[in-house]
């Protein structure tokens, strides 16, 4: 899994009044259900505030990420761990999942590749809400039953992550584009309906070569997506998104991850 933390934030505050009454509040810059990992980020912020972590080294970030994942699971929204890890660590992440263990792989995209993505990657919100746990449930049932199509789709997504990581570290833009397309193929194998809300807008952009690759964010089925615009075509892509009623979101990389301020 390759992911990136961006500068849309979840914030949590914990206060204890003079009578010892504790109150916790949280907010987020983007809607829950948008596919941007908002639930994971909110829970990382919430648990970091409750823990009152004075130091946030790598071990502490891993701890709060896992606590946030387990908290979500208890609430019945069990998905992957990637959103919590991205929120806790910030920046670029290349994650390997082995059972319940998460291994953070060495990963450092070169600046030219990051500048290229910053210039050409369009982030849009369709405004169609989804619940990732609900979307995942049927897929995992099929996986548990030995569905070969689901297994093939998951393998395609896993191999695409390796290709994406290599492409970003070596500025192999052809590999980045191929990785986007392989992820889409893998998702279609899991459930073609996950891409359903996007096709009417995205397919014409692909056919016209205005877009070279794209990806539904989160579980798909609505929420946000990213589109990799061809050189000189970003304005055309943005215009198509806005014509469809989608909201364009400005983004930049957040390299800090979770932080705690005590006062």
Where are these regions (language model features)?
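C-terminal nucleotide
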Residues: 3, 10-15, 27, 31-32, ...
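DPxDG-like acidic metal-binding loop motif
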Residues: 36-58
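Alpha-helical scaffolds flanking conserved acidic
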Residues: 61-65
């Amino acid at each position: 899994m390759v992911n990136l933390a961006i500068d849309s934030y979840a914030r949590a505050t914990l206060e204890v009044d003079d009578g010892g009454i504790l109150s916790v509040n949280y907010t987020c810059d983007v809607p829950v259900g948008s596919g941007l990992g908002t639930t994971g980020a909110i829970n990382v912020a919430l648990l970091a505030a409750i823990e009152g972590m004075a130091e946030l080294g790598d071990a502490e970030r891993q701890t709060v990420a896992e606590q946030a994942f387990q908290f979500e699971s208890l609430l019945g929204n069990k998905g992957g761990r990637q959103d919590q890890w991205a929120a806790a660590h910030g920046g670029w992440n290349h994650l390997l999942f082995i059972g319940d263990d998460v291994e953070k792989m060495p990963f450092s995209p070169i600046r030219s590749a990051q500048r290229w993505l910053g210039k050409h990657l369009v982030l849009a919100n369709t405004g169609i809400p989804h619940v990732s746990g609900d979307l995942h449930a049927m897929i995992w049932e099929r996986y548990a039953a030995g569905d070969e199509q689901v297994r093939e789709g998951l393998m395609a997504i896993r191999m695409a992550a390796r290709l994406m990581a290599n492409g970003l570290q070596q500025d192999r833009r052809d590999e980045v584009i191929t990785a986007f397309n392989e992820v889409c193929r893998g998702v279609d194998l899991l459930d073609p309906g996950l891409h359903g809300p996007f096709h009417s807008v995205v397919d014409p952009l692909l056919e016209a070569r205005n877009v070279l690759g794209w990806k539904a964010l989160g579980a798909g089925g609505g929420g946000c997506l990213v589109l990799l615009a061809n050189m000189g075509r970003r304005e055309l892509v943005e215009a198509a998104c806005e014509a469809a009623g989608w909201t364009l979101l400005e983004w930049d990389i957040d390299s800090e991850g979770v932080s705690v301020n005590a006062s």
